[in-house]
């Protein structure tokens, strides 16, 4: 099994193969990807769809001298396997294993780290211009999906690239008509019309030579969705940007891909190759439902993904989705917005029930936030469902377009804190720090499912921009209460009181997901625990009361320590005039790698045992140094 694949330790081995061996290699590679992902979990549909394209690129171009940048990066498993990491695939996305995304520190073939979308053309253009300036003769290639092409950054890069007439730049549009959620908007409709223009590529002067080696475009067009008879295809958007447009060609046909790429290799200036692929190619279950198989956990390939037979705890994403539907039923002003994450953000049911108030704006976080601001000015109640890591992309809009005008937009921030197997690129580590400094913002962190629901309801009642952060995955098992209860603004609650005598009293000020492990640590240490709830406005009265009745204060958050929730507590303490030693616990001043979420928390000292250990070493051991006012541990 895998007789050909076992001979490939790097692309140089691939380039030594006879052309006739490449399709059998593709079959082995696809089977290997399926087998690997079924054992580790990970992205599947997208990787099954890029097998032939990956082989063709490494076969034609002299990698790593020629640079390949993979947009988003979750479709790079075939690339990793062909570039020396075949025998490490069992560790994919595991603790201390290889990353699920390109990483420069992992391989010289990973020329640019990616994970967020629409960055590849900018990076590849920079490489192409850099190579020119250095006098190097190499191609720089960006592989970008049709979903990622809806983001403005991709077109900013193309606008810049189009005037670089001598750059050896190739942009490959991997057109599978499928981002995580179906691509939306006028641009996608334009691409669909372009793709369905049956005689377009053959008729274009200057492209006939490149395409002459490929099967007739007419044959490919029969596989594509046809539009109304007699439709006139508009001039391509890509040529208007100064690119030489080539295609579309079948992205699963090596006899089309390889000679086309060989011809492109001889050209100069920006080239744009349009390839049509199918997500899940070669595995019928994934072909039929590429969303379900986009990022599965472990499963049996022979049986496919089966529903769990054991009752699962409700996820925070499900809590949000149910809350949004309930609020929309009560109030016709509620509008839901997602930047291309309908399934991931829990908005499938909302779209079905409230289609006229559901807006998927595509991979356009900046637009999503300002669009929400515009809705708010008209008296509507916009709710932006967004991952913490993607809100970073709309920071200026958050400040300039929403907070500065004090517009009542609700930000439902999913995937806050560490995110496990997706790693540092997707971690929600910074939202508390970067939002806390913005005037007019209210920020809450949920400690359980019902508190999340009630916080979201509270946020919807506020006259200013308000954020509720909650983590990825299942909650604590707390049942949600159907009736809504508004949480008093800026008020935390004490969940446990110490019985220790004076001189040993420790108060733990916990935020969001850190309430549960803090309670576990408190049981061991007999400490007080406060569920702070609000990061802004922080409960200054509670901070003062705890400082006055305890000897030591500890803040705990699943976010970066620098500038985060703990810093808000220290600032409140300084304002109170009460001096107490403070220990701040949170994520370290470094990027936390991928792996099991529980293991990563333990690594950061943020599980119950780690919190107790830090407190004991800092305050309660005979050698403890409690001099000074505050100390950060991360």
UniProtKB/Swiss-Prot annotation:
Q: Is Cytoplasm included in the keywords of this UniProt record? A: no
What is the protein name given in its UniProt record?
1-deoxy-D-xylulose-5-phosphate synthase
Q: Which GO terms describe its biological process?
A: 1-deoxy-D-xylulose 5-phosphate biosynthetic process; isopentenyl diphosphate biosynthetic process, methylerythritol 4-phosphate pathway; terpenoid biosynthetic process; thiamine biosynthetic process
Classification via InterPro entries: Dxylulose-5-P_synthase, THDP-binding, Transketo_C/PFOR_II, Transketolase-like_Pyr-bd, Transketolase_BS, Transketolase_C, Transketolase_CS
Q: What does this protein do?
A: Catalyzes the acyloin condensation reaction between C atoms 2 and 3 of pyruvate and glyceraldehyde 3-phosphate to yield 1-deoxy-D-xylulose-5-phosphate (DXP).
| GO molecular function terms listed in the Swiss-Prot or TrEMBL record | 1-deoxy-D-xylulose-5-phosphate synthase activity; magnesium ion binding; thiamine pyrophosphate binding
What is the required cofactor set for this protein? Mg(2+); thiamine diphosphate
GO CC annotation, single:
cytosol
The keyword Metal-binding appears for this protein: yes
Q: Which cysteines are joined by disulfide bonds?
A: none
What is known about its subunit structure?
Homodimer.
Q: Which reaction does it catalyse?
A: D-glyceraldehyde 3-phosphate + pyruvate + H(+) = 1-deoxy-D-xylulose 5-phosphate + CO2
Return the SUPFAM superfamilies for the record.
Answer: Thiamin diphosphate-binding fold (THDP-binding), TK C-terminal domain-like
Q: Which pathway does it operate in?
A: Metabolic intermediate biosynthesis; 1-deoxy-D-xylulose 5-phosphate biosynthesis; 1-deoxy-D-xylulose 5-phosphate from D-glyceraldehyde 3-phosphate and pyruvate: step 1/1
Q: Which residues bind thiamine diphosphate?
A: 74, 115-117, 147-148, 176, 283, 365
Q: Keyword annotations for this protein? A: Isoprene biosynthesis, Magnesium, Metal-binding, Thiamine biosynthesis, Thiamine pyrophosphate, Transferase
Q: Which HAMAP family match?
A: DXP_synth
Note how many cofactor molecules are bound and how: Binds 1 Mg(2+) ion per subunit. Binds 1 thiamine pyrophosphate per subunit.
């Amino acid at each position: 099994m895998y007789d050909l694949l076992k001979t490939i330790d790097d692309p140089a081995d691939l380039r030594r193969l006879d052309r006739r061996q490449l399709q059998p290699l593709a079959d082995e590679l696809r089977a290997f990807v399926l087998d690997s992902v079924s054992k580790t979990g990970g992205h599947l549909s997208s990787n099954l769809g890029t097998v032939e394209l990956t082989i063709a690129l490494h076969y034609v171009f002299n990698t790593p001298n020629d640079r390949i940048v993979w947009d988003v990066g979750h479709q790079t498993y075939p690339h990793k396997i062909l570039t020396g990491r075949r025998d490490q695939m069992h560790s994919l996305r595991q603790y201390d294993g290889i990353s699920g995304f390109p990483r420069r520190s992992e391989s010289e073939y990973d020329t640019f780290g990616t994970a967020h979308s629409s960055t590849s053309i900018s990076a590849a253009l920079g490489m192409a211009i850099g190579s020119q300036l250095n006098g190097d003769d190499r191609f720089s290639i960006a592989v970008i999906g049709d979903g990622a092409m809806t983001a403005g950054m991709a077109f900013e890069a193309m606008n810049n690239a189009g005037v670089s007439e001598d750059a050896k730049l190739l942009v490959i549009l991997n057109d599978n008509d499928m981002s995580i959620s179906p691509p939306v908007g006028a641009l996608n409709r334009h691409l669909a019309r372009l793709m369905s223009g049956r005689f377009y590529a053959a008729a274009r002067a200057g492209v006939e030579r490149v395409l002459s080696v490929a099967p007739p475009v007419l044959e490919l067009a029969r596989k594509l969705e046809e539009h109304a008879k007699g439709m006139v295809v508009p001039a391509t958007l890509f040529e208007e940007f100064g690119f030489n447009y080539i295609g579309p060609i079948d992205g699963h046909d090596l006899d089309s891909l390889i000679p086309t790429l060989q011809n492109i290799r001889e050209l100069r200036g920006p080239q744009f190759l349009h390839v049509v692929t199918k997500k899940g190619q070669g595995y019928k279950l994934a072909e039929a439902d590429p969303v379900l198989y986009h990022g599965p956990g472990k499963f049996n390939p022979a049986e496919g993904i089966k529903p769990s037979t054991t009752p699962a705890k409700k996820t925070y994403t499900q809590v949000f989705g149910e809350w949004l539907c309930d609020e929309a039923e009560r109030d016709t002003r509620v509008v839901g917005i997602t930047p291309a994450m309908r399934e991931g953000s829990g908005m499938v049911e909302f779209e079905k029930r409230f289609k006229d108030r559901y807006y998927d704006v595509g991979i356009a976080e900046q637009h999503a936030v300002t669009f929400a601001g515009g809705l708010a000015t008209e008296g509507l109640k916009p709710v932006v469902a967004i991952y913490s890591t993607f809100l970073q992309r709309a920071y200026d809009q958050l400040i300039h377009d929403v907070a500065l005008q004090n517009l009542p937009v609700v930000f439902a921030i999913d995937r806050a804190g560490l995110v496990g197997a997706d790693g540092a690129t997707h971690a929600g580590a910074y939202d508390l720090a970067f939002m806390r400094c913005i005037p007019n913002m209210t920020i809450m962190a949920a400690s359980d499912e019902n508190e999340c629901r009630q916080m979201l309801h509270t946020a919807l009642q506020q006259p200013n921009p308000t954020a509720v952060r909650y983590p990825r995955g299942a909650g604590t098992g707390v049942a949600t209460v159907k009736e809504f209860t508004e949480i008093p603004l800026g008020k935390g609650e004490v969940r446990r009181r110490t019985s220790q005598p004076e001189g040993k009293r420790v108060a733990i000020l916990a935020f969001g997901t850190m309430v549960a492990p803090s309670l576990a640590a408190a049981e061991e240490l007999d400490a007080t625990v406060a569920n702070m709830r609000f990061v802004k406005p922080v409960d200054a009265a509670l901070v003062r009361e705890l400082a006055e009745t305890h000897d030591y204060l500890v803040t705990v958050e699943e976010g970066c320590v620098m500038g985060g929730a703990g810093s808000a507590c220290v600032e409140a303490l300084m304002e109170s005039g009460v001096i107490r030693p403070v220990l701040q616990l949170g994520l370290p001043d470094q990027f936390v790698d991928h792996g099991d979420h529980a293991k990563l928390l333990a690594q950061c000292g943020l599980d119950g045992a780690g919190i107790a250990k830090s407190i004991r070493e800092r305050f309660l051991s005979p050698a403890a140094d409690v001099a000074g006012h505050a100390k950060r541990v991360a």
